Amino acid sequence: MNARTRVGLVMLATLVATAAAAQPPAWPSATRYVDPVNGLSLEQAIAHALEQEPSLRAARTQIDVAQGMRMQSALRPNPTVSFERREEPQGMDNQTMVSLEWPLDLFRRDARVAVADRQVAAAELAVADRQRLLIANVRARYGDVLTVVRDLRLFDDLVAATGRQHDLLRARVDEGATAPLDRDLVTVELRRLESERVLQVGRAEAALIELKRVLGMQPDAALMVRDSLEDVVLRESAATASSANDASRIIEQRADVREAAAQVDIAGAKIERAEREGRFDVNVFANYARMNNGFPQLGVAPSGGLTPIRSVFHYVAAGATVTVPLRNHNQGEIAAARAEQNGAALTHEAARLAATTELAAARARDDYARQAVTIYSSGAQGLARHNLAVVEQSFQLGRVTVFDVLTERRRYIEVERGYTDALRGAFEARTALNQAIGEGR
């Protein structure tokens, strides 16, 4: 064996070792994230989030707060009881008095309760709106997972197919039937696809963690999804969104619009409360007094003897105190409440306009997104897959070059990713439509 041969063998061994070292580890495939039987469906994800998501649970406590304030507003003011004892220094006279004062709270209780009732209703509507937004967020995060998993499944298949082609070309090169360039071109393509696949795994992990967050789950909790992006989109396309034609009714039933209307009612109730608190009020009172009085001199008793001049006297009094609104009619609070009502009315008008615009835009987006999916699914996607299969078979028969296979494969990737974008657009459009309508699914 000459020196040139030995050098060649060393270089070949080095290349083989380098290629072996460059072999990627076994990354998770798309099946790692999908379980068609025991996985979490979209409906289950929404139900789980409505029950467990921490910020929604915190928002629900505001209803308890409002109900507690409602209970407090219905209570009458407490009566006042006073006790008084008077003693004469260096003497024997004394006086004991017990008084009771009872506020009548005229005109005020009903107004307080009316404000509190409307605040309870507003708190419930605020939670309902928070649920509406949470459902949309869960759908968005669930859709992110489905989108990335679909791309990952695509690259799983492409890596497997390209790997088989690479093995075939390597065998042909070893037999001398194919030029090494063809093998090297496929090797580069295989490494590119493997790199893209690894990136998709990272995106899938991140999307799954974000989904766990909106579900109220820890990042390390086990979670697999049940649905595929295509199944969800096609299922929702077959179902009719309950938007119908009555846009005005839909807008008025939305939780955020109703909450804005409730704020107008609260402001109106505050005006009534302020006006009633500016009226007169009456407190009734009563007291009992016992007086033990006398003089240091002695008097003559009926029997003719001397007796101390001292006696015990009992007094009972009753009356009423009236608060007269002579200068303070609560004018400032009434003016503030009216200004608050005007602001709440404008906020309600803005909420209705925003909801109307959101609904119209969501309907248009949903219609065109469904049409885009139909265009892809009615022929483009299947034809692209068929074209790739034909080119690959032609390559195996020696009718086309490896360049043709690589070109057609990249064209197929573009079509599949375009279909994924169309599916994702349709899913996001239906999410936006459901959010605009206020549907809980």
Please give the residue ranges for each predicted region:
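Periplasmic alpha-helical coiled-coil/stalk elements that build and connect Gram-negative outer-membrane
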Residues: A3, L125-I251, R365, A369, ...
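Metallo-beta-lactamase
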Residues: Q200, A255, A422
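Amphipathic alpha-helical segments within well-ordered protein domains
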Residues: I46, E101, D167-R170, A247-S248, ...
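Small/polar, glycine/serine/threonine/aspartate-rich low-complexity segments that form flexible
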Residues: A26-N38, P79-D117, S228-A238, E272, ...
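Amphipathic alpha-helical coiled-coil segments
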Residues: A58-R70, R130, L134-F155, R164-D167, ...
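Terminal intrinsically disordered/low-complexity segments used for targeting and assembly
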Residues: M1-E51, V201-R249, L298-V300, N434-R441
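Amphipathic alpha-helical coiled-coil scaffold segments and their short linker/junction regions
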Residues: D35, A45-L50, T178, D182-E189, ...
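A glycine-/polar-enriched beta->alpha junction
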Residues: A47-R57, D64-N78, V98-V115, L125-R132, ...
